[in-house]
């Protein structure tokens, strides 16, 4: 999973204007980087120009996907990733970037400019392109799910480690003196109920 490009554009009008951008082209050969970078800028500019206010869209081009979010304020975010990068974290990140950009640079600063300048750059993009290579950093739900999956794995390993070699939970339940007869019966009934659903 990889993010190659993050861009913020002034949209609306015939041609979108790139206000701030960052690229991570380290995956490409030295001599390819310039051409790939130019293509990504061209692609981002084109899709930003052709995305209506309030729209989100993902456009596949070769091995890449351009995630685009155009806001009603006249600003648009573009994220170019590989095909494995999940869609929800991509749009979560775009929303965060556009929110922060509008706070740092109100519309009055960029609405009438004819070309970009350093004053309109968003310095956090350099941090974001490395931090959010891991999509779970952008998506809190995905992060919680990942933590739950890790906990589940630890629990399964713990139960296996508690049981000695060749020992089975059924035998431990039968030998247990701390379980009442009704608890033992409940365990056996629950096991039977669960086993009837197994497809072999």
Curated annotation (Swiss-Prot):
Membrane topology designation: Lipid-anchor
Pfam families membership: Longin (PF13774), Synaptobrevin (PF00957)
Annotated GO biological process: amphisome-lysosome fusion; autophagosome-lysosome fusion; endoplasmic reticulum to Golgi vesicle-mediated transport; Golgi to endosome transport; Golgi vesicle fusion to target membrane; intra-Golgi vesicle-mediated transport; intracellular protein transport; vacuole fusion, non-autophagic
Residue numbers carrying Cysteine methyl ester: 197
Main location: membrane
Keyword set includes Secreted: no
PTM-bearing positions, type Phosphothreonine: 158
Covalent lipid sites (S-farnesyl cysteine): 197
Compartments, record wording: Cell membrane
The keyword Cell inner membrane belongs to this UniProt entry's keyword annotation: no
CDD domains named among the record's database cross-references: Longin, R-SNARE_YKT6
Annotated EC: 2.3.1.-
Cellular component GO terms held in the UniProt record: autophagosome membrane; cytosol; endoplasmic reticulum membrane; endosome; endosome membrane; fungal-type vacuole; Golgi apparatus; Golgi cis cisterna membrane
SMART domains: Longin (SM01270)
Protein name according to UniProt: Synaptobrevin homolog YKT6
Organism, as annotated: Saccharomyces cerevisiae (strain ATCC 204508 / S288c) (Baker's yeast)
Gene that this polypeptide is encoded by: YKT6
